[in-house]
Amino acid sequence: MAINDVTRNLGPSASQSHTSEAIGHAEDLSKIITNIDPDMTFFMSRFGEGPDATSLNFSWLTEHLEPPKVNAQLEEHDYTSGRIGSLRGMSNHVQFFSKSGRVTDAQRKVAKIYSPDDEKAHLMKRVTKQMARDMEYAITKNTISRPENGSAPAMTGGVPFFMKSETIECTLETTGGVITTSSEHNMKTGDFVYFKATTVPTGLKVGEAYYIRLNDSDPLTKFKIYNTLQGAVEGLAADQVKPSTAGTDLVVELNNIVDLEGAADYTLDDINKGLEMVYRRGGNPTIAVMSAEKKRTFSKLITAATTINRGMKADRKLDLVATAVETDYGMITAETHRMYDHDRIDILDMNYWDIKWFDRVKEVTGLPKKGSYLEFVIEGGFGLQGTQPLASASILNIKR
């Protein structure tokens, strides 16, 4: 293999009077290396930074206020008290990342036609960007969180780990409208629920919010549902929902998930459903992260609903590109992520997502020299903290 990648005609030349006969011409080659690879670190650039992790498994606590209830006291009354408040713990793991390479001593010394002249500096910059992509991939794609186990490295749960469907199986008694969950539901009278089912009970709507009233006999697993908050709090019979059939595979959806089950593309109604779920819980999402393909769909949905009434003639054409929409629950902006697939959209409140560094990215120093080449390694470790996933929503299993 040739040491020099430029093959020159060493002559003798026919003459040096004309370019077609002369030799010794210099190359016109730019010193700048053009790289069209896109920037893919969407979340790494936008998520906040929490306090550094001090353990390979880190945890945090969440809570929410109890629903409102009727609170009217006599002028003269005795004080009563009860247990109050509930906390929920969440956790994630630190994932370690590294990239390495090597370059020969000769390759570092030979003159280059591009910058930087030292090949190590060029390659270090390259692998640093590549590792940033690997980190972004973990945030974007990791569906599990796990500790290191033998030869299996630890993985940090990414956005899909936090934004996934979580359900409790339940059964419906049609006579009294009592719903029984398969495990303790940890809800209070006045909380709202969403249902999913293979066969939806007659009189129940998927994606509709219902307010619950705990059953006196077994409040940990039984409740009734109502159309209004007041109906649930005050037990108004006229507001109770009593489906006429039990349906099949009925579950309560605990997270803000709109599941299209691969049957259809998403619509503006689906975005509004997700936003409504978050709104009811107190979140304030501002961006919807999606693939470029689904961003085109977003633009078409918005422009299709736009009315042009400026007396446009039939032979005139108006092209619009929409990136944001004002909904009943606030302004939402569509953002494309180069790593996103077509099957999901994440509607995020960016105030509740943080990167927790355990080991910030650095070059490993002091590596022993093994031969006529130089090895280099960069490494780092972090975990993702989805502080409050209920402040965000996701549309899943979108049909392409």
Where are these regions (language model features)?
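Internal mixed-charge
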Residues: 88-108, 117-137, 279-305, 323, ...
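Alpha-helical scaffold segments that mediate packing/assembly in large oligomeric complexes
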Residues: 109-178, 205, 245-273
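Assembly/oligomerization interface modules of large self-assembling protein complexes
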Residues: 24-104, 124-125, 147-148, 152-154
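Sequence/fold signature of self-assembling virion shell proteins
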Residues: 2-38, 152-169, 253-269, 273-276, ...
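Glycine-centered loop/turn motifs
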Residues: 68-80, 190, 207, 342-345
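Small/polar beta-strand repeat architecture
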Residues: 167-261, 300
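A structural detector for beta-sheet-dominated domains
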Residues: 61, 104, 173, 180-182, ...
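Acidic Ser/Thr/Pro-rich low-complexity disordered segments
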Residues: 71-87, 228-244, 312-317
